[in-house]
Amino acid sequence: MNMSVNIAGIEWKNPVTVASGTFGSGAEFADYVDINKLGAVTTKGVANVPWAGNPTPRVAEVYGGMMNAIGLQNPGIDLFCERDIPFLKQYDTKIIVNVCGHAPEEYLAVVERLADQPIDMMEINISCPNVNAGFLAFGQDAHHVEELTAQIKKIAKQPVIMKLTPNVTDITEIALSLIHISEPTRHS
């Protein structure tokens, strides 16, 4: 059965991916999951420099489930490009890199580094706190989201997915601010 899909001009063999943050870059699960069967791997967030993440405990049981607060622990873009991208390239799956940052210049530094890497898409995590916006989630302001997205689209050579925060009264305002810059990026 053909389950292929085209997402932003990228042909996937199937529409199955893992959510960012749940799968690392796949190495942790390679002995348990056939990565070749996934349409894509969406990596854990990567920043311009390594982040230690939150102190432990990071997971707590709550009524009806559990909560976690990992804090976007990651190795930083340099080690990610050196170690994680080559690991993922050995598999027959698309690579979506989740990009995180505290400020626009941090996001842009990671996007610039990834632009020439052999990846298929970028997912920009704009629900991270932003030091330049009074510690509000960057993705809660339509103007900030639109401005950052436009800057990223000028640099990225891969399609860009904006990971919107659900922590807003009306997410449609944020989404609508991106419509005029939503055309796929294509660089020669």
What would you call each of these model-derived segments?
Residues M1-I95, G101:
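N-terminal capping/small domains of soluble enzymes
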Residues G21-F23, N98-A109, I161-S177:
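Active-site glycine- and acidic-residue-rich loops that bind
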Residues I179-E183, H187-S188:
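Single conserved hydrophobic/aromatic residue that forms the stacking wall/gate
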